């Protein structure tokens, strides 16, 4: 079997040296992706296309599907490559190939020709089209909007009978641009923005700020691995996980409520910039869209950018949510994003939409930056190829209950402000308050002879914190969902 890879048009308008470099990189990317399917596969580059030849017919559909997901490819032609002698020979071979497809259909013939011949492309179109029209009684020629277009390519003494055309994702080959670090949360926005930078030729590494324990990290790892495996597996990339719970805890304890959102984002950019510098990455990528949430106004985005010299790319800045969700659906991350948890303890009640730099800096003076330095230093860096094995490991389960026993205590893990605004009162059981960001250091001080039922508004943070405590060896925790 043989496939002809057509280049993304923007590649073809580059200078000769740049075009050759892009084609060489794309050829290498194709080899890297396809070598797992067929070791005998050959990839040959030409000036205006790339040939892929393989012997294992059983892998035809798999190879074709993989090619449609490699950045830099405009479309793929599945062809049968045969020799020919003259125009009548071309017609006879086309008749054998297309007779069944044209039965009862309208059609036209389109020919591309390279090399020296005593006929033109139009001559072949007329001759083959006329012959097919005569020999297939139910077929009819229609030059505009036909049911079937018969595609032929003539190259020197070879005829390419095109059996199918399949669209690629376009863009530039990965590796033609410099590396970037995507701040991935597992939601709609960060997945789509990561894909867009891969499609533009960047090798995308991933940085995840963990706010909710192992279960949340496993979910985000699955999204990152899916994106890499589907669109970027030609290159090795990193997945860096930073435990940001201590940072969130410090913010919730010391920072004014209205400034929390912007300061949290500034801390994330600071941390990601340190990671990017450590690994020689040139830019950060976020899924922020203008005006989508309070921290994404122009004023707030400028203040967020101010904390780092690292370039921050926002490919979705002008996109609305519906467009982003549609893109997530197209690339296959929608289902991941819909099931990704939101956090009930990390959101300000009255966030500012127009932060003032002097106020932000004054609030940040209360923050202990040694905490930020420590979480970055302890960041977990893994090769994304190892994620499939790691995420396959069993996650500790935690029991969810809707009633309680005589030895149980409800543990309200919401932030202090939330608890003051809406105190939790349940008849027949004690309620103890301990904000989630203090659980890692204070839970051990509680009476370990009691069973603690963790509770929060949405039930997401309580489950994740219960999982975290179970992983730390505490067996006396459950999730309370009345």
UniProtKB/Swiss-Prot annotation:
Work out whether the entry's keyword set contains Transport. Answer: no
What keywords would UniProt list here?
A: ATP-binding, Cytoplasm, Disulfide bond, Nucleotide-binding, Redox-active center, RNA-binding, Thiamine biosynthesis, Transferase, tRNA-binding
Domain THUMP: start-end pairs: 61-165
**Which residues belong to any copy of the Rhodanese domain?**
404-482
Recorded catalytic reaction(s): these are: [ThiI sulfur-carrier protein]-S-sulfanyl-L-cysteine + a uridine in tRNA + 2 reduced [2Fe-2S]-[ferredoxin] + ATP + H(+) = [ThiI sulfur-carrier protein]-L-cysteine + a 4-thiouridine in tRNA + 2 oxidized [2Fe-2S]-[ferredoxin] + AMP + diphosphate; [ThiS sulfur-carrier protein]-C-terminal Gly-Gly-AMP + S-sulfanyl-L-cysteinyl-[cysteine desulfurase] + AH2 = [ThiS sulfur-carrier protein]-C-terminal-Gly-aminoethanethioate + L-cysteinyl-[cysteine desulfurase] + A + AMP + 2 H(+)
The record, for CDD domains, names: PPase_ThiI, RHOD, THUMP_ThiI
Q: List the disulfide bonds.
A: 344-456
What's a single GO BP term from this record? thiamine biosynthetic process
Record's GO cellular component terms: cytosol
- Which SUPFAM superfamilies does this chain map to? Adenine nucleotide alpha hydrolases-like, Rhodanese/Cell cycle control phosphatase, THUMP domain-like
Superkingdom of source: Bacteria
Q: Where does ATP bind?
A: 183-184, 265, 287, 296
The catalytic activity of this protein is classed by the Enzyme Commission as 2.8.1.4
GO molecular function terms here? ATP binding; CCA tRNA nucleotidyltransferase activity; tRNA binding; tRNA-uracil-4 sulfurtransferase activity
Give its localization. Cytoplasm
Which residues are the active-site ones? 456 (cysteine persulfide intermediate)
Function noted in UniProt: Catalyzes the ATP-dependent transfer of a sulfur to tRNA to produce 4-thiouridine in position 8 of tRNAs, which functions as a near-UV photosensor. Also catalyzes the transfer of sulfur to the sulfur carrier protein ThiS, forming ThiS-thiocarboxylate. This is a step in the synthesis of thiazole, in the thiamine biosynthesis pathway. The sulfur is donated as persulfide by IscS.
Family statement drawn from the similarity comment of this UniProt entry: Belongs to the ThiI family.
By what name is this protein known?
A: tRNA sulfurtransferase
Gene behind the chain:
thiI
């Amino acid at each position: 079997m043989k496939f002809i890879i057509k280049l993304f048009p923007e590649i073809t308008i580059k200078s000769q040296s740049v075009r050759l470099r892009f084609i060489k990189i794309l050829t290498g990317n194709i080899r890297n992706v396809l070598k797992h399917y067929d070791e005998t596969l050959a990839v040959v580059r030409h000036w205006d296309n790339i040939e892929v030849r393989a012997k294992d017919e059983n892998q035809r559909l798999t190879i074709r599907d993989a090619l449609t997901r490699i950045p830099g490819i405009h479309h793929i032609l599945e062809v049968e490559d045969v020799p020919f002698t003259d125009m009548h020979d071309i017609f006879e071979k086309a008749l054998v190939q297309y007779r069944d497809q044209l039965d009862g259909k309208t059609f036209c013939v389109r020919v591309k020709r390279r090399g020296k011949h005593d006929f033109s492309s139009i001559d072949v179109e007329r001759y083959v089209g006329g012959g097919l029209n005569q020999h297939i009684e139910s077929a009819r020629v229609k030059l505009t909007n036909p049911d079937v277009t018969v595609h032929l390519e003539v190259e020197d003494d070879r005829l390419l009978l095109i059996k199918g055309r399949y669209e690629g994702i376009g863009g530039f080959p990965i590796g033609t641009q410099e590396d970037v670090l995507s701040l991935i949360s597992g939601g709609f926005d960060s997945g789509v923005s990561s894909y867009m930078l891969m499609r533009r030729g960047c090798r995308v590494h991933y940085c995840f700020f963990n706010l909710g324990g192992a279960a949340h990290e496993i979910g985000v790892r699955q999204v990152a691995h899916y994106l890499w495996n589907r669109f970027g597996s030609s290159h090795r990339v990193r997945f860096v996980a930073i435990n940001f719970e201590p940072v969130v805890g410090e913010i919730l304890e010391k920072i004014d409520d209205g400034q929390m959102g912007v300061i949290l984002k500034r801390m994330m950019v600071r941390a990601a910039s340190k990671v990017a510098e450590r690994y020689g990455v040139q830019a950060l990528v976020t899924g922020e869209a203008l005006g989508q949430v309070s921290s994404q106004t122009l004023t707030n985005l400028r203040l967020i950018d101010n904390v780092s010299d690292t370039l921050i790319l926002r490919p979705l800045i002008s996109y609305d949510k519906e467009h982003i969700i549609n893109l997530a659906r197209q690339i296959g991350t929608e289902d991941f994003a819909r099931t990704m948890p939101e956090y009930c303890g990390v959101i300000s009640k009255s966030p500012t939409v127009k932060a003032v730099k002097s106020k932000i800096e004054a609030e940040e003076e209360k923050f202990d930056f040694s905490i930020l330095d420590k979480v970055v230093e302890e960041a977990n860096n893994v090769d994304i190829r190892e994620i499939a094995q790691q995420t396959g490991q069993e996650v500790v389960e935690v029991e969810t209950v809707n009633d309680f026993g005589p030895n149980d205590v409800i543990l309200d893990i919401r932030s202090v402000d939330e608890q003051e605004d809406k105190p939790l009162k349940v008849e027949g059981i004690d309620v103890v308050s301990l904000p989630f960001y203090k659980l890692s250091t204070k839970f051990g001080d509680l009476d370990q002879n009691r069973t603690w039922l963790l509770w929060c508004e949405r039930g997401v943070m309580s489950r994740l914190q219960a999982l975290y405590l179970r992983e730390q060896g505490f067996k006396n925790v459950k999730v309370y969902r009345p």
